[in-house]
């Protein structure tokens, strides 16, 4: 009889825990995805802060030339970064216990792999938590779908690209200057500016910014007057009010006359779906582009594609970009190889002396 009571009490304890985890009454919703999200993101954040401040230099290229990335080793906020795991490690799983010592683990850039893998797991769980909370509240699932765009982008630069290139050392460094370095090298090696998926991503980000500014300014310009000239217009809105706070007919009429009638939405729901879908689809395409270029399916190559009747090359902007790419490729990892792959692939002319 005692054993039965103990089992019921433990089941009740587990039940209370489940109810607390899935309760929508908590100040912050936890959820089952949150059970995994919280420790992974806390780990990634903690290690990032410590490594950004105090990590020793990392042998990123695997040639015994460590690169400094932390504040205590001479960097500032702009130049500092978490240096990617060494090329000597490649794609190997490299937890602390796989190294001979903590010093070796730090020298080979172990913190980068730890941070990136925990971070990707954490943001994926955050996306799942968004869906979970929407489900519990009876909402539609589009918040999590929208968040999938930045999750896909982060996964592309931190995981898919290193897998395609064969080493975590090719992943994006975790810092401001490191991000710029990654972008420049990516352009040099993959000609991303000439990739149509990147172009769609640019249209998504810039177009999304434009549409957001247009929508916000139209709404703000067509607010229904509820206040005097001496009060803030924001005082005319009360949270939860049933009445519209702006005149969508006036906004529609203004924009329809500014451009043309059918350029303006007359349905608030389809308008807001469009505002969400445009940047999300654009960023999806960019992430897909990064993932294809990871395996060297690169941007368009129009180098020396225009010639005159004598066969002489007429340079276009594509040739200017190509020259810039070669210059950037020559400069990066300059001690790891003598020539960039484009130049080294050409057989050297023989000299008969």
Curated annotation (Swiss-Prot):
Please list the GO biological process terms of this entry.
photosynthetic electron transport in photosystem II; response to herbicide
- Binding residue positions for Fe cation: 215, 272
| Recorded superkingdom | Eukaryota
Modification sites for N-acetylthreonine: 2
Q: Where is this site: Cleavage?
A: 344-345
Which sequence ranges are marked TM in the entry? 29-46, 118-133, 142-156, 197-218, 274-288
According to UniProt, residues marked as the site described as Tyrosine radical intermediate are: 161
**Main location class:** plastid
Q: For this protein, what is any one GO molecular function term?
A: electron transporter, transferring electrons within the cyclic electron transport pathway of photosynthesis activity
At which positions is chlorophyll a ChlzD1 bound? 118
Looking up Gene3D superfamilies in the UniProt record yields: Photosystem II protein D1-like (1.20.85.10)
PTM comment, free text: Tyr-161 forms a radical intermediate that is referred to as redox-active TyrZ, YZ or Y-Z.
What UniProt keywords are attached to this protein's entry? Acetylation, Calcium, Chlorophyll, Chloroplast, Chromophore, Electron transport, Herbicide resistance, Iron, Magnesium, Manganese, Membrane, Metal-binding, Oxidoreductase, Phosphoprotein, Photosynthesis, Photosystem II, Plastid, Thylakoid, Transmembrane, Transmembrane helix, Transport
Per the entry, what this protein does is: Photosystem II (PSII) is a light-driven water:plastoquinone oxidoreductase that uses light energy to abstract electrons from H(2)O, generating O(2) and a proton gradient subsequently used for ATP formation. It consists of a core antenna complex that captures photons, and an electron transfer chain that converts photonic excitation into a charge separation. The D1/D2 (PsbA/PsbD) reaction center heterodimer binds P680, the primary electron donor of PSII as well as several subsequent electron acceptors.
Q: What is this protein called?
A: Photosystem II protein D1
Origin organism of this chain?
Ceratophyllum demersum (Rigid hornwort)
Task: Name the lineage.
Answer: Eukaryota, Viridiplantae, Streptophyta, Embryophyta, Tracheophyta
Q: Which gene encodes it?
A: psbA
């Amino acid at each position: 009889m005692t054993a039965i009571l103990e089992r019921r009490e433990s089941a009740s304890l587990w039940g209370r825990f489940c109810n607390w985890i899935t309760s929508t009454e908590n100040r912050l919703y936890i959820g089952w995805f949150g059970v995994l999200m919280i420790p992974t993101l806390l780990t990634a954040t903690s290690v990032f802060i410590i490594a950004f401040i105090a990590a020793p230099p990392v042998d990123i290229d695997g040639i015994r030339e460590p690169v400094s990335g932390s504040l205590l080793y001479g960097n500032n906020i702009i130049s500092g970064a978490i240096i990617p795991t060494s090329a000597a490690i490649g794609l190997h799983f490299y937890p602390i216990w796989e190294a001979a010592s903590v010093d070796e683990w730090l020298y080979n850039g172990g913190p980068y792999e730890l941070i990136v893998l925990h971070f990707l797991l954490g943001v994926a769980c955050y996306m799942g938590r968004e869906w979970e909370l929407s489900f519990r509240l009876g909402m539609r699932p589009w918040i999590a779908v929208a968040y999938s765009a930045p999750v896909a982008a982060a996964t592309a630069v931190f995981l898919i690209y290193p897998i395609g290139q064969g080493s975590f050392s090719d992943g994006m460094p975790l810092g401001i200057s490191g991000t710029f370095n990654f972008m420049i090298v990516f352009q040099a090696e993959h000609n991303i500016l000439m990739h149509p998926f990147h172009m769609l991503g640019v249209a998504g980000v810039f177009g999304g910014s434009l549409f957001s500014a247009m929508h916000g300014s139209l709404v703000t310009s067509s607010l229904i007057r509820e206040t005097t000239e001496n009060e803030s217009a924001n005082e005319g809105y009360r949270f939860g009010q049933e009445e519209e706070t702006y005149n969508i007919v006036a906004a529609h009429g203004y924009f329809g006359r500014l451009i043309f009638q059918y350029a303006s939405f007359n349905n608030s729901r389809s308008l807001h779906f469009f505002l969400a879908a445009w940047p999300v689809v654009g960023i999806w395409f960019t992430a897909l582009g990064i993932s294809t270029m990871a395996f060297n399916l690169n941007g368009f190559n129009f180098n020396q594609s225009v010639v005159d009747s004598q066969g002489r090359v007429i340079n276009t902007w594509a040739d200017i970009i190509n020259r810039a790419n070669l210059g950037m490729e020559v400069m990066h990892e300059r001690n790891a190889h003598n020539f960039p792959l484009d130049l080294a692939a050409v057989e050297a002319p023989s000299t008969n002396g």
